[in-house]
């Protein structure tokens, strides 16, 4: 079977948004080649993860490649893709250069091409993300290994927004909590939360493809097989308060989630948000404070921000 590969050259900050655009246009899979991921592979405080010189890698920006089957007439969807990429500036994201190119590929070529870009990476103090096909043994005490099968649409777990979310979880989880993972995607945050001691988790995503992907990854991690993953639009229709609500989604989606999170958090419960570009932070913080949340901490990595907030108790 022949496929059409549609590739977009863009910035690190626009990777997730461009990936969403391509998938919403009907892509059967997405490959992400992000220079930021390779930067994270360099030796650091947790030691060397991989020999960077041993793999081909991008030194700046990012390329997102999506794959469309013969049943989709790609020339018809290209104008919309180009327009939506350029419109990302309206959401505070820089998509430049935003160039879109296409080429034909066969089934075998795209089915395995992405694997060379994915390696074990120490994401936080306690959490390492590794692909399911690579053997990896923890090298430090209390290191938890999250195994993912990203398939042909994946994130490595090293994007700043994911790192911020995992760091926030490490800061607030004490063990035994209940949690909602909103916009779960690959399910990586639910798996991380289980390793950190969260007891009961329900993961939601509007995209049923993402839900299936999350279920696959949950099954790869025995500690997380009891996580319930199902389709839902944010927390609409959910009326059962929990101790934690986690959302790694764009600021524009966080805003309508704020009142839903408030209604679904127990007093003292934490609301952890990421996916916030720096220019949108003030708007997100203002919305949370207006709702009644107390802002505990602002985390930052590159141009991205994460917010740790909680619903105050009656005594506060």
From Swiss-Prot:
S-adenosyl-L-methionine binds at residues 162, 183, 205, 248. CDD domains: AdoMet_MTases. Its main location: cytoplasm. GO terms for cellular component: cytoplasm. Its EC number is 2.1.1.-. It is an enzyme of class 2 (transferase). Keywords: Cytoplasm, Methyltransferase, S-adenosyl-L-methionine, Transferase. One of its GO terms (molecular function) is protein-lysine N-methyltransferase activity. GO terms for biological process: methylation. InterPro entries: Ribosomal_L11_MeTrfase_PrmA, Ribosomal_PrmA_MeTrfase, SAM-dependent_MTases_sf. It comes from the Bacteria. The keyword Cell membrane does not apply. It is found in: Cytoplasm. It catalyses: L-lysyl-[protein] + 3 S-adenosyl-L-methionine = N(6),N(6),N(6)-trimethyl-L-lysyl-[protein] + 3 S-adenosyl-L-homocysteine + 3 H(+). PANTHER family: ELECTRON TRANSFER FLAVOPROTEIN BETA SUBUNIT LYSINE METHYLTRANSFERASE. Methylates ribosomal protein L11. Belongs to the methyltransferase superfamily. PrmA family. This is Ribosomal protein L11 methyltransferase. The gene is prmA.
């Amino acid at each position: 079977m022949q496929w059409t590969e549609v590739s977009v050259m863009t910035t690190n900050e626009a990777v997730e948004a461009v990936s969403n655009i391509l998938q919403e246009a009907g892509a059967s899979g997405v490959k992400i080649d992000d220079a930021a991921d390779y930067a994270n592979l360099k030796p650091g405080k947790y030691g060397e993860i991989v020999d960077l010189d041993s793999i081909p890698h991008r030194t700046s920006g990012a390329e997102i490649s999506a794959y469309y089957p013969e049943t989709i007439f790609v020339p018809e969807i290209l104008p919309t893709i180009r327009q939506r990429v350029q419109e990302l500036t309206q959401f505070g994201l820089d998509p430049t250069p935003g160039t879109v190119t296409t080429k034909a590929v066969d089934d075998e070529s795209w089915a395995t091409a992405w694997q060379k870009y994915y390696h074990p990476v120490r994401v936080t103090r306690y959490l390492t993300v590794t692909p399911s096909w690579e053997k990896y043994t923890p090298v430090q005490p209390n290191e938890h290994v999250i195994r993912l099968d990203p398939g042909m649409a994946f994130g490595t777990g090293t994007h700043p927004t994911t790192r911020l979310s995992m760091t926030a979880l490490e800061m607030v989880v004490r063990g035994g909590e209940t949690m909602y993972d909103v916009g779960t995607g690959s399910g990586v945050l639910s798996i991380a939360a289980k390793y950190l001691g969260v007891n009961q988790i329900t993961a939601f995503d509007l995209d049923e493809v993402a839900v299936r992907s999350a279920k696959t990854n949950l099954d790869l991690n025995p500690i997380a097989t009891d996580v319930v993953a199902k389709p839902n639009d944010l927390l609409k229709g959910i009326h059962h308060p929990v101790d934690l609500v986690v959302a790694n989604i764009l600021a524009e989606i966080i805003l309508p989630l704020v009142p839903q999170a408030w209604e679904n958090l127990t007093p003292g419960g934490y609301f952890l948000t990421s996916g916030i570009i720096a220019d949108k932070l003030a708007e997100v913080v203002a919305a949370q404070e207006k709702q009644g949340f107390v802002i505990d901490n602002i985390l930052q990595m590159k141009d991205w921000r994460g917010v740790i907030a909680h619903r105050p108790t009656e005594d506060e």
